[in-house]
């Protein structure tokens, strides 16, 4: 896609449980990206990253795309799309090949990556990414850039990400029904890491947590490479539900209260401050302490980060 000035444009879609986001960027002659359009629409057709109502999903995608097109003054035909959700699986793999010409080439790297995929995975899952963690040449570990190095045997430790075939196809179908060609599907937390993590952080070791509506997606880097990914089935919608239950207020109002007033620790709020909470039905609204709201939110996030900590502990890193 291109604009009237001849510059190339690209578009991306974040199809989440709570909202759909569309982003349009222009690539200038220096290969730099400049955001020129943005669209967002509430999502009601997904649950924990999986399409449960394709018509609602199509409508939300279409509205987000049209809004982005209007702001960017362009027509969007192709998109990069993120994927996440409870259907995502990940595990480690290992491949070994003989170096063909005595010096590692791209063909050798492609071959060892393919060899690492030679394992049994469930028939309802498809390999989305094979992410190299480490290369080994004739027993020498820790090789990051093997091309051009001499040796006889090349090994690769990789991290493999798979997605549900049906979940992926339903997301693709939703976009295609909006007249969009899907250029590439990418794991959400991997895409997020490109935006927010520096090379130093990846080298030293970092865990990125992308908290969505239905799930929280994590990716762990060490030594500059991805070493683990995980999807936690807890997200912002769970906080909204907790608020609705604890304060006895409708879910829509609970979401607004979360956005306007929520805090993740009760120590940060004024104990004297009150907020108005709508009641269920025709009952009059009530005044409650902001500290009470904070305690509800804090409990859920403490649970989330305890689960994340446990999962990291299981990763053997």
Task: Tell where the protein language model's regions lie, with residue ranges.
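ATP-binding/phosphotransfer module of carbohydrate and carboxylate kinases, centering on a glycine-rich
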Residues: 306-317
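C-terminal catalytic subdomain
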Residues: 301
